[in-house]
Amino acid sequence: VKARLDAKTNTKTDAGNDGNIKLKRAWAEGKYGATVVRLGKFPVFTEQGVLFDGEMSGAGLTLGADRTVSATLYAGRYNLEDSAWGDEITEAKEAGTYTGGTTANMQGITLNWDPSERFHLGVDYLRLGNNKLLTGMMDVKDPLNYYGVGITYRPVQTVYLSGGYWKTNSHESAEIKKEHMKSYNIELGYKGADESDPGSFGVYAAYRYIGGMGTIAPTFDGAMWNTKGWEIGGQYTVLKNVV
C-alpha cells in the first residue's frame, strides 16, 4: 500500500496555512512479472504529461512494464475541480450558476513503444464524461474523447528532443474548435535532475500550446493553461529528494 499526505505550512509562524492535512493519494499496488495492478486513488501520467498529470480513484493496469511494448489502462472517477478548469468551476459554484456534481467518469489508455534507449513513441486515448458539467455549464460535447501521440529522440544520452500533438472532439463552433480543442508540445533538453542524485541538473527550452479544452490537467509549471508560447527552465537537485 502506498500513500501521500499533503499539508501547507507558514514557516514564519510555524503554523499550518489552513490547518488541514489532505490525503493526496492512497492505493494498493501489486506487481506480477511485467504486469502492475493499482487499486485506490493513484497517480496517472499520460504521454509527456500533456493531457493529464494527477490522481484519480479507480483501477489501473500496466501490461509489459519495462518492456519494448507496454500499455497502461485506467478507469475510475476524477474531480474536475482539480483540473485546469477548476477555478472556473469553483467560481460558477460560488456564483450559483452551477449546482451539479464535479466528479467525472474517466477511462484511458497509453501505449508505449521503446525500441531502444534513443527513441520512444507514446499514444494516448482518454475519455471523460459528466453530462451536466460538460454540456450544461461548459457547452462542450459529453463525453469528451481525447487522443494524441508523442515522440522522444535522444541523439546522445544527455540530449533529448520531444514533441507531440493532442486533440479532443466537441460540437462547439469551428472557431472555438480551431483555437481551443488541441494542445502541442515541442521541447529540447539537456540532461535532467535526478531526485536521488544531489548536484544533478537539467535545462530545457520548449514551445507549448496548452489549449483551453485540449488538456485536462497538464504537468507543466511554466506553461499556463489556455496559453501558447516559449518556456525556458531547468531543475537542480539540492539534496536527496529535494529538486
Model-derived regions: residue spans:
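Outer-membrane beta-barrel pore domains
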Residues: 15-18, 33, 118-119, 134-243
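Short, contiguous, pocket-lining structural segments
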Residues: 99-103, 127, 139-146
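Outer membrane beta-barrel
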Residues: 1-88, 92, 101-125, 152, ...
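A conserved mid-domain beta-alpha-beta active-site/ligand-binding segment of alpha/beta enzyme cores
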Residues: 124-128, 133-135
